């Protein structure tokens, strides 16, 4: 039985969209779900990563290979990036190296943005910290719109294609890389939240005064959490820019990259990475369904169908908060050692300490 090309394209696009949003939603879940930091400026990290892709790799490759000497990268962006892509098509190793190096730089930019965003208000209560992060998210949008040397403002720029060497399989290769990075992020966060550090984050979220009384530096831990989450958000933004092949400032605004991740986390269940996976899948399926059937749905709605997803997802968020605020998969107790392993550990410890006790009794 042959699989139609349309179905393959649908599954591929679905997987890419799902993986990118999952990375960003997981980073938000680390901040809000596990640490209690209401990051209402998630777009800051995402846009920072995307802007890095628009600024960094094209200039580096053009400089290394002497492309576009005497030309302005922003003004002559199309011509320069076209020549850059010709070079990358014949050098897969360099292409992948540039791709990975750009992700590293995007992560570093995300860390700096996270530090700058949280530093002024990290000692304040969660509501004031959330407002500060919201303001920082708005600030990077204004910079992207008006400071043209980065990504040419509202006109946008093309970005180098590190997967052009794959030919017709370009999008399949992109999907493999993005899904692979998404799995690494998920694995890292699962290990983190199951560790003593994860239990400490929950303790800070539940009662920071008690945590401070036990000697925990709540301010520093919150700051580190925001920085780590911003690194992940920036990597997600960079992957989105590479996938699109170009970047424009208007693509990175708070509805898509702050509101939607919040919907995902609330829908799936905060402080539960599997819940975020389910929420991301439900969100992606809903968005893809509306995108593919807009024309068929248009006669049944009394307004422009482009606003349908905003309306329905907003209603879904309200209903979830009213009737199931814990999300589809509620938070579960932190996994520790299994009963079998714990019993084995206790027996081994008691066996070691018994000879010592007997030796003391002899004397």
Which functions belong to the PLM regions below?
Residues 1-363:
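Transmembrane alpha-helices and adjacent helix-loop boundaries
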């Amino acid at each position: 039985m042959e699989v139609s090309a349309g179905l393959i394209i649908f599954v591929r696009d679905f997987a890419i969209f799902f993986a990118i949003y999952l990375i960003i939603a997981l980073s938000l879940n680390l901040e809000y779900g596990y640490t209690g930091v209401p990051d209402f400026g998630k777009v800051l990290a995402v846009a920072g990563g995307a802007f890095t892709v628009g600024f960094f790799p094209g200039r580096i490759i053009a400089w290394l290979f002497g492309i576009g000497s005497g030309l302005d990268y922003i003004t002559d962006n199309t011509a320069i990036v076209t020549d850059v892509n010709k070079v990358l098509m014949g050098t897969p190793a360099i292409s992948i190296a540039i791709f990975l190096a750009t992700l590293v730089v995007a992560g570093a930019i995300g860390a700096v943005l996270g530090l700058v965003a949280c530093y002024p208000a990290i000692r304040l209560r969660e509501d004031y910290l959330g407002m500060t992060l919201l303001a920082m998210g708005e600030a990077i949008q204004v910079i992207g719109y008006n400071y043209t040397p980065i990504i040419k403002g509202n006109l946008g720029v093309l970005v180098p294609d590190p997967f052009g060497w794959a030919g017709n399989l370009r999008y399949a290769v992109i999907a493999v890389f993005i899904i692979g990075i998404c799995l690494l992020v998920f694995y890292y966060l699962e290990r983190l939240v199951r560790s003593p550090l994860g239990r400490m984050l929950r303790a800070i979220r539940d009662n920071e005064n008690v945590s401070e009384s036990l000697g925990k530096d709540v301010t520093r831990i919150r700051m580190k959490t925001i920085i780590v989450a911003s690194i992940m958000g920036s990597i997600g933004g960079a992957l989105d820019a590479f996938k699109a092949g170009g970047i424009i400032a208007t693509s990175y605004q708070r509805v898509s990259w702050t509101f939607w991740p919040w919907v995902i986390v609330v829908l799936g269940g905060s402080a539960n990475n599997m819940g975020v996976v389910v929420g991301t899948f439900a969100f992606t399926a809903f968005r893809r369904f509306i995108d593919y059937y807009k024309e068929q749905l248009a006669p049944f709605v009394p307004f422009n169908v482009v606003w349908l997803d905003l309306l329905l997802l907003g209603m879904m968020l309200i209903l979830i908060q009213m009737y199931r605020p814990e999300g589809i998969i509620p938070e579960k107790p932190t996994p520790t050692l299994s009963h079998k392993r714990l019993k084995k550990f206790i027996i081994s410890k008691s066996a070691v300490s018994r000879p010592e006790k007997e030796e003391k009794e002899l004397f």
